[in-house]
Design a protein with these regions (language model features):
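Detector for the canonical C2H2 zinc-finger "Cys2" submotif
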Residues: 52
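N-terminal juxtadomain amphipathic helix
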Residues: 65-67
Length: 229
């Protein structure tokens, strides 16, 4: 009964782990920085490349017609197809806010709950695609860091920390500081080296000049997705 009363207000570990069994009809292979907006569990605006372009060759029977390069075909008068190499696995870094400003929402769920759901969705999608998952979970007072790993147990630990910080949220908490987004990004800027994916999950309250500088530095050699709750 108590769990039903708290549904949408607080998350549970079992609730987050269920995302591992849900269909995830999106890609985490963006070709450029993407700013997405998420409501509940529905993600939009994330477009992926999936494969890296390698070379062009003349079409032969059996080639995938979806890869025909129509510009080259028109120019030469002969059908040409683009050849792709599958991308390597990479680190997917989740930066999850459980700040006091996230303890607000609609009748359906709190923003803090939506952020937790989003993190679970991305984490299990990354595992499905063979990527490694790391995370920084932060609130107004603390930052918890998890190294990137392809282990499901690592994701369970991340979800456990999200649940813990989520249950610290209270309506009467008066700490309205900017939180630890800048500190979280500072940690990541030294870890996300090249071709990693960084997913920022939260509201805009924690953003400041320091955070913006770190994001610019990270985005120079990595992909960054912002999920605004």
């Amino acid at each position: 009964m108590m769990e039903n009363q708290n549904e949408g207000v607080y998350v549970t570990l079992s609730e987050l782990l269920r995302f591992g069994y849900m269909p995830k009809n999106f890609t985490i292979r963006p070709s450029a920085a993407v700013l997405s907006k998420l409501s509940g569990r529905h993600l939009s605006g994330v477009r992926g490349r999936g494969m890296d372009f390698s070379e062009m060759k003349q079409y032969v029977q059996g080639d995938d017609t979806r890869n025909i390069d129509w510009k080259a075909t028109r120019r030469t008068g002969k059908p040409y197809v683009r050849i792709y190499n599958e991308e390597r696995d990479r680190n997917v870094w989740l930066v999850i806010s459980q700040m006091n400003s996230m303890f607000f929402g609609s009748k359906e769920r709190m923003k803090s709950v939506s952020a937790a759901h989003t993190a679970a969705l991305f984490a299990f999608k990354a595992l499905e695609t063979g990527d490694r998952v790391g995370a920084v979970v932060y609130n107004n007072e603390e930052v918890k860091f998890f190294k990137a790993s392809s282990s499901k147990n690592n994701v369970v630990q991340i979800m456990t920390e999200i649940e813990r910080q989520n249950h610290l949220l209270k309506a009467d908490n008066t700490n309205n500081s900017k939180g630890n987004l800048s500190e979280s990004l500072k940690i990541l800027s030294s870890l996300a080296k090249h071709d990693d994916l960084v997913v920022l999950i939260g509201d805009a309250r924690a953003m400041d000049e320091g955070s913006a500088r770190h994001i610019t530095r990270i985005n120079a050699h990595n992909d960054v997705i912002g999920v605004i709750i």
